[in-house]
Design a protein with these regions (language model features):
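Short, extreme N-terminal segment that most often corresponds to the first beta-strand
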Residues: 1-21
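Short, flexible N-terminal segments of the mature chain
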Residues: 15-44
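Low-complexity intrinsically disordered segments
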Residues: 36-112
Length: 112
């Protein structure tokens, strides 16, 4: 089960896509297919990783891997995302848990 909010890491893209809730996921999942490649994955607020698989060619279905991203690896992803969003002081970006990092990604998107 996904702990919302979450972010999607698209293969080959340094930006993270924020998904705020299960309702938002259901509403936007079809449009996310446009960007989908085989190695895309979702990271939930607990750090669990879900592979994204096609179902019926028009739905992405998150499949739990049982793996969790480390806090340091997630900080690195958020710093890269911030760098591509032309944020300054990316070296200072830090947070205590994955949920705080996902909230930070959301706030970066709100500033655009």
């Amino acid at each position: 089960m996904i702990n919302w909010p979450a972010v999607i890491k698209f293969d080959g893209d340094d930006e993270l896509t924020y998904i705020g809730s299960a309702d938002e996921w259901l509403r936007d999942a079809q449009s996310l297919l446009y960007h989908h490649k085989g190695d895309d994955y979702l990271i939930d607020s607990s750090g669990y990783i879900f592979n994204l698989e096609h179902v019926n060619d028009d739905i992405l279905n998150p499949q739990g891997t049982g793996s969790q991203i480390s806090l340091q690896d997630f900080i690195r992803l958020v710093r890269i995302h911030a760098s591509n969003s032309h944020r300054c002081c990316i070296e200072k970006i830090s947070f205590r848990n994955i949920a705080e990092g996902i909230s930070l990604v959301s706030s970066m998107n709100d500033d655009n």
